[in-house]
Each structure stands twice: as C-alpha cells, then as structure tokens.
Amino acid sequence: MPPAEVVVGIGLRRGTSADTIRAALREGVADHRIAGLATIARRRAEPGLLAVAADLQVPLRSFSAEELSVVAVPNPGDRTRTAVGTASVAEAAALLATGGGPLVLPKRVVHGVVLAAALYRR
C-alpha cells in the first residue's frame, strides 16, 4: 500500500532555515507523502518555508489567526494563543487545508519545528 498523502501544518519561529524544516519533515512525516504545506499567514513569506515548498513542488497555504482559532484541535496551546492569537497553528492549518482532515499526525515538535498532518483527499 502506498504511503498516505497528507498536508503538513507547520508552526515555526521567524528565520527557521530550509535545512531545519527539511530535517523536521524527514523525521516527522517520513511515513507519508506530502501533498501540501500550511501555516499561519504571518509566516507565509518565511524564506525557509518557501524554499521547502518549492523544493517539494507542493502548494503552501496560509490562514489568518482568526481562521485558525475556530478550528477544534486535540492539542491546543496557551503559549501559542498568547504568541500568535490562536491556540493552534500546525494542527489547525493542516485541518483547514484539507477541508477537515482527518488528522493523521497530531502536533509534534521536531528540531524546533511544530508539525501536524491531515489526510489529503483529492
């Protein structure tokens, strides 16, 4: 059976390098095929994230904190809410980008990058 296609939601700090993001994806979602990336709008133009999306030849979707904040997620974070105005970036972005999931990889931090993945359906 081929690996499932997923959209990976990503939360990261400003200035995170493409190499760090690639390493996190290799380690964090190795059992899945990446069909897209998603994040919060304020990180949409991060050079490292743009480079990884281009390398993978997948779309990068972004959502406002307001859009992300209405998504029910299993692992909300108070620190995230305080920092960016929503309790979830990675899980909520993955779920929004896929139209509701399901979430196949709950939030995890790999090399300082927060990852979550939701099943991509064509």
Segment roles from a protein language model:
Residues 1-41, 118-122:
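Conserved mixed alpha/beta catalytic, RNA-binding, or beta-rich assembly cores of soluble enzyme
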Residues 40-89:
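Long, charge-dense
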Residues 26, 30, 54-61, 97-101, ...:
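Generic secondary-structure signature for well-ordered alpha-helical cores
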